[in-house]
Every structure is written in C-alpha cells, then in structure tokens.
Amino acid sequence: MRRILAGVAAVAGGALLIAGCSSAGSSSSGSSSGSTSSASAAGSAPVTVRLGYLANITHAPALIAVKNGYFAKELGSAGTVKTTVFSSGTQETTAILSGQIDAAYVGPNPAINAWEKSGGTAIKIVSGAATGGASIVVKPSISSVAQLKGQSLATPSLGNTQDVAVRYWLKQQGLTTSTTGGGDVAIKPTTPNSAAVLEFKSGQIAGGSEPSPYDVEMVQDGGKVLLSEPGTTTVLMVTQSFLSAHPAVVNDLLKANLDALNYIKSDPSGAQAAANAELAATTGKPLKSAVLGPAWKEITFTADPDAASLNADAQQAESVGLLKTVDLSGIFDLTPLNNLLSAAGQSSVSG
C-alpha cells in the first residue's frame, strides 16, 4: 500500500521541507514476486533505496515508475524504493549531500551544484529523463524585455535550473539581477511552484521562469510565453557511495526508468493518465486536461542526459555568480545505462 507522509526534516543545519514520502509498489517492501533482480540473484541482502523527485510533469518518468510499479518490479526481492517528493531540486541537493537520500530525479543545475560542492565526490548522473518543459511566462502587457525592468519574476528556488536560466537570459539582454532580489529585475524564488502561479494570478509578480505544468498554468491564467527554455530538464543522479555499494540495484533503477520512458513512447495517453494519477496521490489534486495536454507536449522524455546542455548550464550558472568554476569531467557514469540500451537494441548515449 502506498504511504504518504507529510513533515519537515532537519538537514544540514536547515529545515528541509518534505512534501511527501512513500514506499513504491504494492506493499511496504516494494518487492514483486514476478521479478528477480540481479542483486537478489547474487544473494545480497535487501536494500532500501531512498529516491527523491518533484511533483512536476518534467519528472513524469519517476511518477509513472511509482504509479505503475516499475521500481517494485525491477528490484524484485532485492529491496524497496522509498520515495520522497521535494518542492525543489535545491532541496534534493541538500538531502543528497547530507545523506538523506541515495538517488534523485533532479534538474541539471542542482546536480551540478552537488558535484561542485562535494569536489566531484558525491554524485554521478546515470541517466537522463526529460528535456524542455520550462518557460518564462509574463503578463500580457509585457511585449519587450525592456518592460521587465522594475518587475518581479518567480523561480522555483535559488540556483535551480529555471532560476539560472532566467538570470542568464536577462543578463544577455542587459538587465541585472541579484541573489537577494535586487537589480533591474527582482528574482523571487518561490516554493512551492503553485504559490508562484497564485502570485501571478493575483498580480503580485509579473511572471516566472517555471517548469511544466506551472508555466502552462500561468498561460491559462492569462500569461504569455516570452521564452521557451530548451535543453535538459531532468536527470537521474545517484550518490557515488550507493553506486559503488549497490551497482546491481542502480541497474534496477535504470531498468525502471527505461520502463517508464518506453511506456511514455508506446502509450502517451496512458502515460499521461498514470503521471496525473500519481500527481493527484501526492498533491491531492490532479491536473486539468487543459493543463496536462499542453504541458506534456512541450517535453521530450529521453534517457539521454545531453552532456552539451549540462556544460552550458554550468557556464550560465558561473556567469551569473551562482556557481564557482567547475570541471564536469567524470560527472556522468552512463556505462550501466548504455549496456541496457544496447541489450534493447537502442542507441547509446554519451556523457
């Protein structure tokens, strides 16, 4: 039975909001008699994998893998996937660096931050999940970038992928921002994303740089897309310690991720329904079809993490002062993924 808990966990000297927590699969063990994982076959003791993700459509592979029981199926009797739903990728980075979770579906910039803060020792990106699916949406009266001067824009959190993207874009347009909300355009990190939508609807902010479905909800509330944000939106990262200790279990996570991606490709309508059902179970409210459809269309779900996009994300974060100069060499470990892709007759990806 799926369990959802609400609470706050103290992590790394700060308060970390946990929006929800559950065990994946049809039982608290997260196991399934219909599958025997490589870890179980090798006689290893059952493992609990603590997995984080966000309640966003850009994290649909995670939502679907939970809803359809793919994690439970692939792990078999090897263990349990215990999921925690976070409000932002920044929170996920804090959790993974403090040992609260073992793996996470996360945006590229939080993954880069985890790599940089740990000196390249904390995490590895083992797969992609989604590209696209984020936009800068503004009120309809704004028709030029110059009109953003003196306005406020929301982002999910300081240093997350959409936060970096809008700051960099504004800098390219000659407008300044600051981490404290100053500058020509005040950037306002707002959690949860739904709060940013409400602030936009009430006129408290001029717009936001938000992932799906929240950018679509802003458009539905009268906004217009000023800029669609391309590139990698979601990757799957694991701690290096967990990968080293449990490579077979990580392989099972990758299988479940591919199961979800294959389902998205083979049955888009069924995949949308599954993702929306899991969103409803997590947030208490499903997305309206008028939001879900457009949100889905702006995302490409793929196992390719797009290394070039990740490098660009790092350079942009450095440019706006949110990241120290960092060497991303070694951040990827795509060998397990490529072995699975090869076995399925699919093209390999590169890091």
Q: What are these regions, as identified by a protein language model?
A:
Residues 246-324:
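Secondary-structure end/capping motifs
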Residues 30-188, 206-209, 225-230:
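Short, glycine-/small- and polar/acidic-enriched structural segments
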Residues 22-25:
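Bacterial signal peptide processing site
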Residues 1-11:
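Bacterial N-terminal signal peptides that target proteins for export
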Residues 184, 188, 192-280:
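Pocket-lining segment of extracytoplasmic ligand-binding domains
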Residues 72-78, 297-306, 329:
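Short, solvent-exposed loop/beta-turn-alpha elements that line the ligand-binding surface or hinge
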Residues 315-351:
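Conserved C-terminal helix/tail region of periplasmic/extracytoplasmic solute-binding proteins
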Residues 15-20:
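C-terminal motif of bacterial Sec signal peptides marking the signal peptidase cleavage site
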